[in-house]
Amino acid sequence: MAGFAALVSVFIYTSASAVATPAAPQPGPGGRFAVTVAQIAEPGGFLTALGTVSTLAGVILLALWAMCAASDYSTGVIRILVQAEPKRIRLLTGKMVALVVFTLLATVATTLIVVLVSHPLARLQGIETQAWKTDFFPHLLSAYVNFTVAAIVWGLIGLLLAVLTRSSALAIGIGAGWLLVVENLIGITAPDATPYLPGGTLNALISGGTSKLGWLPALGLTLLYGAVAVSISLVAFHRRDILS
């Protein structure tokens, strides 16, 4: 993810000078590639690339969580684990905790890369960075928390799909297809519903709120999606026949 963050940052800063006005937001998640120099130069502008990275990070983490959860089924290790730890809730919860810790480290690294490359890239493009000093740490902390919460929820959705399908390929296909295709199609036919779908909600959270969905409602809806994913995963894992 850190490598993607660096590449996206380069694209954002090098293309900003050629953008006269911000492009209209596209339906569905993502769509923050085109930004203006003025947007980058404003307070908190050093985190501009993080909004675009978030969509890629969401797909990557959904895939990683899904593979970690589904690989035990494909290898047959799940039977050994369940026999060694009959309390399935504890078993799946432990896996979730380990994946959350990994996600925290990944989002720290990604955020740091975005911040570290922002100043050199801005200087190369002649973008003024004086305003970045205004509330630097509050902007950084807020962006990191929003990004991390969204990343964890994407991971939980990937884990949910893996538990239900028992297949990493199927789980990743469904998750990525929903995020990159289905939500965009819904955005074309029913644009008012887009902000409340998983991708639109998480994108609104990372953006600090939008005109259609404020930060607090986005946070609440994001946490709701996460809670639903955890609940369904635990119930399905607890009740499903694994040993036979």
Locations of regions flagged by a protein language model:
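Secretory targeting signals
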Residues: 2-64, 68, 92-164, 203-224, ...
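Short hydrophobic alpha-helical segments that form membrane-spanning helices or hydrophobic packing faces
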Residues: 1, 92, 172-176
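Transmembrane helix boundary and interhelical loop/hinge segments in multi-pass membrane proteins
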Residues: 62-89, 96
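Junction motif at the cytosolic side of a transmembrane helix
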Residues: 224-244
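Transmembrane helix segments
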Residues: 10-17, 165-200
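Short loop-to-helix capping motifs
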Residues: 1, 86-88, 166-168
